[in-house]
């Protein structure tokens, strides 16, 4: 540890309050591998060992930055940073020693400094403020589609054509509600967390039947460390079902591990990926999650969804028809959800956490899909995935405004800013799985 400065004569209380100084080496040792977890924000060192379990955003997301500088993710994720800092005072244990740099040598200082200037510019431009009318209209269009689905059966009967049309409309409702709950979950609609949380519960719980706490727990980790093995839950299918990226498959091959025939994963992806994720996994796991963690408020919101659809569709369809409709909707929604959410990340760099700077962390793991009215609607503006990852609390209707500024920053520092057509993005998922599988096979057979 860097030596503390020599105490100067003064009141005893002043000496007790004397600042402790630490080095990056000391901080890095408190990464949670043992008992202690420290992190750094604006050169101040915080001990989060006990607090991590009480962290409102989830215990894992904050622990993923243990032993590291967390200044940029702290700024990115919190909308009321002044209030949060007051609660952080009890965790403060010292500062970085004066001779220590402001962040680790693995991070690009010039890039980080310029991104922080860009962040300040974005805030001055008002791009972090939401247009509430946009989100109101978006919610209304979801509710209208929901009503239209029920009216289709009520007016035209339950024969095949109205039944299929109803299923398509309900699938659209579920997909679009998924994008809208994402907005509220990221605190990007209202200026206070309270209103965002309330509407998040309504949309994800009552309109979709899923728990807000589960989404927070999973999704914030993804944003904190995208495509980082054992830190991003979105790539937890590695290595049980898939070998992902270019680094991890080679590791598996060299270790002679074969949980699945990965060289065929680009084929079985169509069976266990898009069609199965929601109806065969998420649909059941979310109930285990809320009961195991005693999230009774979430459970109540979820049950309100099931009660609503049961009492509105059972009288029209009967039990068998209702269950058939429900699982067809989940099947269609699952395909929509998986293709859209994976197109931005699976073809990109996947590795262990290398503790690089915020911009590099997000750009190496993320790509965009070209803007169009359809692409924006179909993906819930997640075609602007780069901008969303750099500024997760930014309202989605402002992504296209900040995109040129991000492109300029990337060009200046030689960072690839990748954007592609929608169908190309879908195809790249399959191509990347095929390439990863071949890398695994080569390492498995020859290394």
From Swiss-Prot:
Which residues, renumbered to this chain, carry the PTM N-acetylmethionine?
1
Q: Where is this chain's protein located in or outside the cell?
A: Endoplasmic reticulum membrane; Mitochondrion
Chemical reaction(s) catalysed: (8Z,11Z,14Z)-eicosatrienoyl-CoA + 2 Fe(II)-[cytochrome b5] + O2 + 2 H(+) = (5Z,8Z,11Z,14Z)-eicosatetraenoyl-CoA + 2 Fe(III)-[cytochrome b5] + 2 H2O; (8Z,11Z,14Z,17Z)-eicosatetraenoyl-CoA + 2 Fe(II)-[cytochrome b5] + O2 + 2 H(+) = (5Z,8Z,11Z,14Z,17Z)-eicosapentaenoyl-CoA + 2 Fe(III)-[cytochrome b5] + 2 H2O; (11E)-octadecenoyl-CoA + 2 Fe(II)-[cytochrome b5] + O2 + 2 H(+) = (5Z,11E)-octadecadienoyl-CoA + 2 Fe(III)-[cytochrome b5] + 2 H2O
* Motif Histidine box-3 mapped to chain: 385-389
The Gene Ontology terms for molecular function here are:
acyl-CoA (8-3)-desaturase activity; acyl-CoA 6-desaturase activity; omega-6 fatty acid desaturase activity
Q: Where are the transmembrane segments?
A: 125-145, 161-180, 269-289, 309-329
Q: Which GO terms describe its biological process?
A: alpha-linolenic acid metabolic process; fatty acid biosynthetic process; fatty acid derivative biosynthetic process; linoleic acid metabolic process; long-chain fatty acid biosynthetic process; unsaturated fatty acid biosynthetic process
The domain section of the record reads: The histidine box domains may contain the active site and/or be involved in metal ion binding.
Q: What name does UniProt use for this protein?
A: Acyl-CoA (8-3)-desaturase
| Gene of this entry | Fads1
